[in-house]
């Protein structure tokens, strides 16, 4: 089996906290130097690399003299603010040894949920790559609470892979890859060398929490691979403790777990909608509407809506739930939540008589709808 990285030109590399810190005691400058050297070697092979790096909070904790990760959000944000300075400085210094310029980009999921900001971020990243710069990306933990509390850079790496239409996402961790079971508890557990991204069984295999320094577990990596597949990006989950891991993957050596994107690449607009981690609201649809969306490729009409949840405006991304509460699709709504409540369960021909106007006959047009 050959590594998919060998034939990939545009890469997103995510390194976890444990691979760039001294077990939480600040940044490991030597380790970061090795990552810079490996990425420099990839660039000499003609590959473009975007680096998603954790480590800001761990560095901030060290600079502030804290030995335990704080629980209070404001203290986490303070640690991130202090640590981000050091993280940027070390990467700039180490990459400069290879005559490579770096750029710091701090993102939140909200940045990528807004269409205009999404396109601006994409344009900036592609320009940096064209200029030969290595973008260093991290979540903007200083201003966002949800990302610190629940988020992870595995997901961010997948979103960035989709943003720049990367060929592959490499998630480097302190584990060898995905096992069929927890190898610490099951001696019969074996490494999953290759599988299709999004296979339901993979989520059942994944489990366990991250360390006290980082936040990501194996499940987040499996879900990140599923998300990266939206843009056709393959994912490799491998141990960053392996010597020269990036060079070996680029040479074709199969290391860790390869998760292959088998589904067709989504159109850019639908990919953006699918990547929303949070939607503004939900509509519950009947079984007939579910069938028309999932099997017939039809638009969602008001008559198929049986319930409205949350507050949303026209043009926002909303989720479509079946009777069991499972999301089956999402898309851009033509009507607000208040308007939808008035026209639900009604045929499109009655919209104007109910509202006094009709913007569109569909609640969500099929061109603005994506199955999930």
UniProtKB/Swiss-Prot annotation:
It catalyses: L-glutamate + ATP = L-glutamyl 5-phosphate + ADP. ATP binds at residues 14, 173-174. One of its GO terms (molecular function) is RNA binding. Its EC number is 2.7.2.11. One of its GO terms (cellular component) is cytosol. CDD domains: AAK_G5K_ProB, PUA_G5K. This is Glutamate 5-kinase. The gene is proB.
């Amino acid at each position: 089996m050959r590594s998919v990285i060998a034939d990939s030109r545009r890469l997103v590399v995510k390194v976890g906290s444990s691979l760039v810190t001294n077990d939480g005691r600040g940044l490991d400058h030597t380790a970061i130097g090795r990552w810079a050297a490996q990425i420099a070697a990839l660039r000499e092979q003609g590959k473009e690399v975007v680096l998603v790096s954790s480590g800001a909070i761990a560095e901030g904790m060290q600079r502030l003299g804290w030995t335990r990760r704080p629980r209070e959000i404001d203290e986490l944000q303070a640690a991130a603010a202090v640590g981000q300075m050091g993280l940027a400085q070390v990467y700039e210094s180490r990459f400069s040894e290879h005559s490579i310029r770096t750029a710091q980009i701090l993102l939140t999921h909200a940045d990528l949920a807004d269409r205009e900001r999404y396109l601006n971020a994409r344009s900036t990243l592609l320009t940096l790559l064209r200029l030969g710069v290595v973008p260093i990306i991290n979540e903007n933990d200083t201003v966002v609470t949800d990302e610190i509390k629940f988020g992870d850079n595995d997901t961010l790496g997948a979103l960035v892979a989709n943003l720049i239409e990367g060929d592959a996402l490499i998630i480097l961790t302190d584990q060898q890859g995905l096992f069929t079971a927890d190898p610490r508890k099951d001696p019969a557990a074996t490494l999953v060398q290759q599988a299709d991204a999004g296979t339901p069984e993979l989520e059942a295999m994944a489990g366990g929490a991250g360390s006290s320094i980082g936040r990501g577990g194996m499940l987040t990596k499996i879900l990140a691979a599923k998300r990266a597949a939206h843009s056709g990006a393959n994912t490799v989950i491998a141990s960053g403790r392996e010597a020269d891991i990036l060079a070996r993957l680029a040479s074709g050596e199969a290391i860790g777990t390869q998760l292959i994107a088998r589904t067709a690449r989504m159109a850019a607009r639908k990919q953006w909608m699918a990547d929303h981690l949070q939607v503004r609201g939900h509509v519950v649809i009947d079984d007939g509407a579910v069938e028309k969306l999932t099997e017939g490729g039809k638009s969602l009409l008001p008559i198929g809506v049986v319930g409205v949840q949350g507050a949303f405006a026209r043009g926002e991304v909303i989720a479509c739930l079946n009777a069991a509460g499972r999301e089956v699709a999402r898309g851009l709504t033509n009507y607000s939540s208040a308007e939808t409540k008035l026209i639900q369960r009604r045929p499109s021909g009655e919209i104007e008589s109910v509202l006094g106007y009709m913007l569109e006959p569909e609640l969500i047009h099929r061109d603005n709808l994506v199955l999930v």
